[in-house]
């Protein structure tokens, strides 16, 4: 899939007041209840393309994304919590799809960046995962980031290679319902400073 023909980086033709991307960002929310329908192939294809076109340090794309649809594997992942009762992630079982971002911290490039205390493999994988989240929202899907999971256990479940690491998980599916209201956000002056 190539960039759309109407793709135009000419800033003089863009109307900032009508940002389609910002509208999608505002619509995205953490969905924890899904319908049982599987995510169809056309939607999966767009999510896969979002991974491919995501930026990464030096365009190395140092990750592999696992699209997990097997119900038993999803249940196993939901049980793999680092601490406390597994019931904290019970909601994950309703998702028809879990996307697992697997980073490659052992690549020479990433080992070199450790001198500056930067985990590029994680940063790159999370950027690509956010691209999935946004296109999924545009396609009428719900998503939720899952940070409370046991990396090594999930890595074993997914049979990832030695030297790789499960960076982050995301549930994806058709929402059971839409939220009745949006969660409040901080004021811009609490979040952004110009210097």
Where are these regions (language model features)?
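Acidic, surface-exposed loops and disordered segments
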Residues: 1-195
């Amino acid at each position: 899939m190539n960039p759309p023909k109407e793709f135009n980086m000419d800033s003089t033709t863009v109307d900032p007041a009508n940002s389609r991307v910002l509208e999608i960002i505002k619509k995205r929310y953490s969905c924890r209840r899904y319908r049982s329908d599987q995510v169809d192939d056309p939607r999966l294809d767009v999510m896969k393309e979002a991974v491919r076109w995501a930026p990464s340090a030096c365009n190395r794309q140092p990750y592999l994304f696992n699209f997990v649809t097997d119900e038993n594997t999803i249940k196993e992942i939901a049980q793999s919590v680092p601490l406390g009762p597994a019931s904290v992630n019970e909601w994950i079982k309703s998702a028809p799809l879990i996307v697992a971002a697997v980073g490659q911290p052992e690549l020479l490039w990433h080992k070199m960046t450790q001198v500056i205390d930067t985990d590029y493999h994680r940063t790159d994988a999370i950027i690509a995962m956010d691209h999935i989240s946004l296109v999924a929202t545009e396609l009428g899907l719900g998503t939720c980031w899952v940070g409370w999971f046991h990396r090594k256990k999930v890595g074993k479940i997914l049979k990832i290679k030695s030297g790789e690491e499960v960076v982050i998980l995301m549930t994806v599916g058709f929402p059971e319902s839409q939220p009745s209201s949006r969660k409040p956000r901080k004021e811009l002056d609490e979040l952004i400073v110009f210097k």
